[in-house]
Every structure is written in structure tokens, then in C-alpha cells.
Amino acid sequence: SHITLECALKTHPNITIISEEVAAKKQTLDEIVTCIANTVAARAKNKENFGVVLIPEGLIEFIPEMNKLISELNELLAKEGEAFAAIENKDEKMKFVIDRLPAELASVFASLPQTIQIQLTNDRDPHGNVQVSLIETEKLLVELVKGKLKKMPEKIKFSAQTHFFGYEGRCSVPSNFDADYCYSLGYNAAAIIGAGKTAYMSYINNLVAPAEQWKAGAVPLTAMMNVERRHGADKPVIKKALVELDGKPFQEFARNRDTWAIKTSFIFPG
């Protein structure tokens, strides 16, 4: 959620979901949907029938019930992937999965729209994990929020437009800093190879200083390894760097989000 948090601090959207907070608070999908729906309703009372919600790409993995479901699906498809792939009918494919899931997770899976069910069971990435960038979490939330609003006594206008910026957010034109930083990383990596060192990752620090004062170094890849389940087996992988909920960026966001939710406070960083 690093990019999502930074975008929130720079633009002040009405709602921003931070995956790490969802996991820490053990929030359910329904609780997230209720929060969004309540904000939409509160803004509607102020005759502000518009708003912006920022959702991180990997959110679905951080919702505890969905995380359990994805882990179970990864295990199931690692063991019975061939039998699943041989089924051509979509409904039969979903029944195949539901019949093999624990009852608690089967009910979660069955409650999802079929488009999301299919996306959760599509081809895995090379590590055997669900490809979260291909799961249309934003469309799932729109459908669930729409259903939640219909159950409210007030008649609330809700017509959502979704946009996926998973790649656009990482492919903007590089700044001078980006160019200097990447050049330095590459130059340093070549120096590490030239010194005959392997299994190290190049790093540059002291980045707040001018480029000529940056410091180069190398860190062993093993120092960053973590054991995770991949293809139904334990594998060493580099652990993800997560948003620190006690860090200053998140704390600044947390202090202001209730205001941004109700009072339109959009800003343009450009």
C-alpha cells in the first residue's frame, strides 16, 4: 500500500484503504464495504454525490477471510490443477472448487460474483500464487457497496466509475532523481560483480543529500529471505516491505482521513 498511501497524502481522497491496516484490524470484506457505504451516505446528506476511493492493488490478499481463501485455493490448485483445468463448464469449475473447500471458506467463495471466482482460480504466477493484479477488486467493492446502499432507508445516488492504475502508477516519466538513482544502482551492481561477490543486492543510501554524497553498499539476499508457501510447498522468497502503521506517513494520514471523508479536501500535487 506504499503507493496508495503516498497518493492519499498528496491528493486527499475521501476514502483510502490501507491493506496493512485491514490485516492488523482483521477487517472483513463486509466491514470494508460498510465503511465505504456509510461515507457515501454521509456525503449524500451534504448534497455531495461524488467522491474518490483509493484501493491498493493487493488489498484482497490482506482481508483475513480472503487471505485464507486464496491460500486454500493455491494449495488446492497446486494439487488438483490438472483435474480443474480439464473441466470446461464454468459453473462446474466453481462447483469443483466449492466442494473441496472447508465449509467456512466455501461459503465465502460462493458469496462472490462469478467473475471474481473465476479470477481467483485463473492461472497462477510463476511462484504458484494468485495474480492479484488480475483480480478486479475495485469492481467487487462497487457491486457490494451498491447492494449495501440499496438496503439503507435513504435513497442515495450511486454510479461508480472504476479505474485500474496498477501499471500507470509505476511507469511515469522518470525524474532526474530517478535517473541518477537507477544509474547509481547499476554502476554499483557492476562494481559488486567486478569484486567477485554474488548473492548480493546493490543499494544506495544517504539519498537526502546531493548525488555526489550518496553512499553505495551491498546486502546479502539471504538477509531478506522469508519462508512462504509457493506451489503447495515452503520456499525462500524475499519478504515484502509493508507500510508501517506506527510510521509518520501513516499517522499523518490517520489524523486527517475522517475530515477528508466528509469534507471535500482534494488537492492537486502538480
Task: Label every PLM stretch briefly.
Residues S1-F158:
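Accessory alpha-helical/coil subdomains and C-terminal extensions
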Residues E154, T162-G270:
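Phosphate-moiety recognition in structured ligand-binding domains
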